């Protein structure tokens, strides 16, 4: 079995709704394989929501005008297609827009139902004069990719309902590039950089996570053909390897005082991993192991980024004053040997 170093994935937030993701190191050639798959999935297969049809009060079709409204129906539809919306409902839901003139109609005038949110309320939809009135019923559905107005048109559509083009994808733009990166003495490994820009309906981080989940599910179909087939196995991450090394350290490397060291050895604690598996209460049950020794152990473990089983991970040794003075207590010999 070939074992490859586990790549790391980091996110750099470039701007609102735009992030840059770096995956490295990848085996030679896998940068383009993974980059192209991620890009196509992000642009075409991330679930989203969009307006699929509208009904305007007093309007029978899109090739007409609304009395008292500056824009014709075609212009209004073009503006409505730019509404960024998210929906938690699997079934179609209806939003309502009602505006009495005079004034500018924006997406903020839309009243969405529970589970639906409009993310660009400043979007201009129409302009109504003093005597004008605009009432619109907007149907919102969930889907993926792009669906044309013709596809949204139902055979039993009620009179006056106008289908619109639906852009479900919440991802606006995805670019990627592959650079060379070094692993020990080799310089031919791939470094994949993916730049993702999304609509306010989803964060780039969630979009990438969704794309990854989709790809895993699809590639899993190929794996099921033969689960015993040989492939490249991903090894532990550098962080996991460093943690394992720290846990394997002998307690001698903690440079504890003689009292604390002898108490732990008598208890059969020889490695750091065995020490962090104990709670403060467990250690206090050890003969001659007191509060000062507990504080000393916590300080030494904190230097490695570790802690006892029931201690907070953010223990700060700098906040501890006079934890221990390093000197032997007057009754040290009696405690150790009697």
UniProtKB/Swiss-Prot annotation:
Substrates-to-products reaction catalysed: RNA(n) + a ribonucleoside 5'-triphosphate = RNA(n+1) + diphosphate
Gene Ontology cellular component list: cytoplasm; DNA-directed RNA polymerase complex
Enzyme Commission number(s) from the entry: 2.7.7.6
Transmembrane portions of the chain: none
Region described as Alpha N-terminal domain (alpha-NTD): 1-226
Gene Ontology terms: biological process: DNA-templated transcription
GO molecular function, one term: DNA binding
Region (Alpha C-terminal domain (alpha-CTD)): 243-338
Domain of life, per lineage: Bacteria
Record has Transcription as a keyword: yes
Similarity comment text for this entry: Belongs to the RNA polymerase alpha chain family.
Biological role: DNA-dependent RNA polymerase catalyzes the transcription of DNA into RNA using the four ribonucleoside triphosphates as substrates.
Quaternary assembly: Homodimer. The RNAP catalytic core consists of 2 alpha, 1 beta, 1 beta' and 1 omega subunit. When a sigma factor is associated with the core the holoenzyme is formed, which can initiate transcription.
Full protein name: DNA-directed RNA polymerase subunit alpha
Natural source organism: Beutenbergia cavernae (strain ATCC BAA-8 / DSM 12333 / CCUG 43141 / JCM 11478 / NBRC 16432 / NCIMB 13614 / HKI 0122)
